[in-house]
Swiss-Prot record:
General function of this protein: May play a role in DNA repair. It seems to be involved in an RecBC-independent recombinational process of DNA repair. It may act with RecF and RecO.
Record-given protein name: Recombination protein RecR
Keyword Endoplasmic reticulum: no
One GO molecular-function entry: DNA binding
Zinc finger (C4-type): 58-73
Keywords noted in UniProt: DNA damage, DNA recombination, DNA repair, Metal-binding, Zinc, Zinc-finger
InterPro entries: DNA_Rcmb_RecR (IPR000093), Rcmb_RecR (IPR023627), Rcmb_RecR_Znf (IPR015967), TOPRIM_dom (IPR006171), TOPRIM_RecR (IPR034137)
Gene3D superfamilies reported for this sequence: 3.40.1360.10, RecR Domain 1
Signal peptide span: none
One GO term of the biological process aspect: DNA recombination
Taxonomic classification: Bacteria, Pseudomonadati, Pseudomonadota, Alphaproteobacteria, Rhodobacterales
């Protein structure tokens, strides 16, 4: 089998590091880009170069932006008393897509993990405590993933914020809309039973 030239192989290897792309998918993507250089590859390379120099973290919340403050933090119509804490920007974007939250966000940049040696100082937890003190936050909503590390992080944050007196809530967990009980794991069913409400 013929090997691709070294620079193309390097591009394939780099593409394969992206989530959802394995070596075969990366190879197909690179071949498509090479086939459509003018329409796909050149504009993609230019956009990536621009984003590499302009993208940065919002100094207030940690969202990705190309200014000091992101559009959400600059939006004066957002509720200033509600702060939704998320693990990463992808979670923030998912909540924004849903359109159900009109407050502000705080992106941690990960979760606590003894296995990966990630402690509170590696995350934006100290900055979260500062924001609660300085911005007059009345409610912190913990929208962290229902993993062991996510729940450990949620409990840690609740303990850190307890002296401030701020109300700390978390997202409900349970049966997804359209979900069938037979297909759900025991933990999800248990969480749904514990979070039940009057019908």
């Amino acid at each position: 089998m013929a090997e691709a030239p070294g620079d193309i192989e390097r591009l394939i290897e780099l593409m394969a590091r992206l989530p959802g792309l394995g070596p075969r998918s990366a190879r197909r993507a690179v071949l498509l880009m090479l086939k459509k250089r003018g329409a796909v590859m050149a504009p993609l390379a230019q956009a990536m170069a621009e984003v590499a120099t302009s993208a940065r973290d919002c100094v207030r919340c940690g969202n990705i932006t190309n200014a000091d403050l992101c559009g959400i933090c600059r939006d004066e119509r957002r509720a200033t008393g509600e702060l939704c804490v998320v693990e990463d920007v992808a979670d923030l974007w998912a909540l924004e897509r849903a359109g159900a939250f009109r407050g502000r966000y705080h992106v941690l940049g990960g979760v606590l993990s003894a296995l990966d040696s990630v402690g509170p100082e590696e995350l934006r937890i100290p900055r979260l405590a500062e924001r609660v003190r300085e911005e007059g936050i009345s409610e912190v909503i913990l929208a962290l993933n229902a993993t062991v590390d996510g729940q450990t992080t949620a409990h840690y944050i609740a303990d850190v914020l307890e002296p401030s007196g701020v109300q700390v809530t978390s997202l409900a967990q349970g049966v997804p809309i359209g979900g069938e009980l037979d297909y759900l794991d025991d933990g999800t069913i248990g969480a749904a039973l514990r979070a039940r409400r009057r019908f």
